Every structure is written in structure tokens, then in C-alpha cells.
A protein has these predicted regions:
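Conserved alpha/beta-hydrolase "acid-adjacent" motif
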Residues: 104-113
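Active-site nucleophile loop of the alpha/beta-hydrolase fold
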Residues: 76-83
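Acidic beta-to-alpha connecting loop that harbors the catalytic carboxylate
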Residues: 101-104, 132-134
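Serine-hydrolase catalytic machinery in alpha/beta-hydrolase-like enzymes
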Residues: 1-47
């Protein structure tokens, strides 16, 4: 959906491949892999505006990596945002966190708390309640895809 939304606009869509399964405590492997991908992108094509999009642990990794100067914003779908997750690095970033309140894997309440804390740190953060989909986003998948694509395209258009 994102690829279609930005087609013909000179946008590269790339995917982070995790080296390890899971977050792995303080190692935060997924976040490190996202940061490595940003550095690899910079080496390949120079400094360009970046929007990070991630689901669940990928949303957490995207939010952690958002301190990179190239990152314009983040779209996080049903992100895993445990209390105490750092937000200080998010000042000046636009963040969209989408979450279905019936999600039983990750907590919408923790996402909304993250949004409040990110705002206090200077981020332009928005929590978007979704009314369908649960964690896997299977029911209403077209809505989730459309919203992710629209928000990603909007973030790329700003600035």
C-alpha cells in the first residue's frame, strides 16, 4: 500500500531485516538493526528524508531509531511501547501511533501514554484509535493499509 501511495514521487521503499528474533532486553536488537539500515541507506544514497513505518516490535524499533537526523517521522501500527520507553530523542519529530483498543498483544493504553510523553519531549505525536483489526490487523486490513500509506505519504510531503 505504501509503495502504491508514493509511486512516481522518487521515493525508495525499503525493508529492515532483523538479524535476531525478538527485542532481547537491553540489547534492543531490532532497534540496532533499524539504525544500521538507516546508516546503510545514507551510505548508499546520501542524506534523504526518511519515514519509518513499523508494526508491533517494528513500531518500537522505528520509534527508537527516530532520533536519527534523517528521520522526518514515524508511523507505528499497534506498537509495543512499554512504560519507560525513551522519548527524549523524539523532539521535533512527527509521530502517528495507530492502535486498536481491543489489541490483546500490545497495549493501546501504553501507546497513548507514549504519545503524551513524546509530546512533553517536543514531538508532534498523535494517537489514532482504530476500531477494528486487533493486533494482527487482519480484520479491516484495507483500512490499516490505507491509513499507513496516507500518513507515510503525508510525512514525506512535509518539510
Amino acid at each position: 500500500a505504501v509503495t502504491r501511495a508514493v509511486r512516481g514521487r522518487g521515493v525508495l521503499v525499503a525493508e529492515v531485516r532483523y538479524r535476531h528474533r525478538g527485542w532481547n532486553g537491553a540489547r534492543a536488537d531490532a532497534a540496532k538493526d533499524a539504525e544500521t539500515a538507516l546508516n546503510d541507506l545514507r551510505e548508499r544514497i546520501g542524506s534523504v528524508p526518511v519515514v519509518l513505518l513499523g508494526h508491533s516490535m517494528g513500531g518500537r524499533a522505528a520509534l527508537r531509531a527516530a532520533g536519527d537526523p534523517a528521520v522526518r517521522g514515524v508511523v507505528a501500527l499497534a506498537p509495543w511501547c512499554p512504560s519507560g520507553e525513551p522519548v527524549e530523542h523524539l523532539g521535533g519529530r512527527r509521530l502517528y501511533l495507530l492502535h486498536d483498543e481491543t489489541d490483546r498483544v500490545t497495549s493501546a493504553r501504553e501507546s497513548w501514554d507514549f504519545v503524551r510523553r513524546a509530546r512533553a519531549a517536543g514531538a508532534d505525536a498523535v494517537g489514532i484509535p482504530m476500531r477494528i483489526g486487533g493486533h494482527a490487523m487482519l480484520r479491516g486490513a484495507d483500512l490499516w493499509h490505507r491509513r499507513a500509506a496516507e500518513l507515510t505519504a503525508a510525512l514525506l510531503s512535509h518539510g
